[in-house]
């Protein structure tokens, strides 16, 4: 396999790790309402687990309120139950036609817990990026050993993958800093 191809595959895989991290960060609660908070909340919709956004309209009319309007009004109870069972710590208010979720202010203690979660998720993403780098390094060494690439090309490839890794880790750190600031903002 060509070095360029290896590096391109590595970059694609690293970008997927970063996209996954962004998705994880979107579902972490801050003091503000966001429809992404409900992404992982699943309800039992006629026997199959479905995300809430596939059975209802979700809107954010105010910075600290989410309104869920199910298309099928009989699903209100199931949606309410799923939200209560989730780890979001939100209490749904039901008026018969829609569910209102008021996002309470986060306590200082809860903010610190959330920051720890942010750090852990960022660290997991860094580990994933480093594992991709290791895979490419191993592939380069294998190619060099098989004499399909020269020693100079292998060393050049190692330098390039390290630069790519450093850039992606920097990007992860920037995302982490933004999310941390968002969580700690009162």
Located regions from the model:
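Alpha-helix N-cap and coil->helix boundary residues
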Residues: 31-33, 94, 131, 135
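A positional/architectural concept
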Residues: 2-77
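Glycine-rich active-site/cofactor-binding loop and its immediate structural neighborhood
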Residues: 64-92, 97
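Positively charged, low-complexity, intrinsically disordered RNA-binding extensions
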Residues: 99-186
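Short, intrinsically disordered, mixed-charge
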Residues: 23, 81-89, 120-124, 134
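Flexible hinge/switch segments at interdomain interfaces of large molecular machines
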Residues: 35, 45-62, 93-97, 105, ...
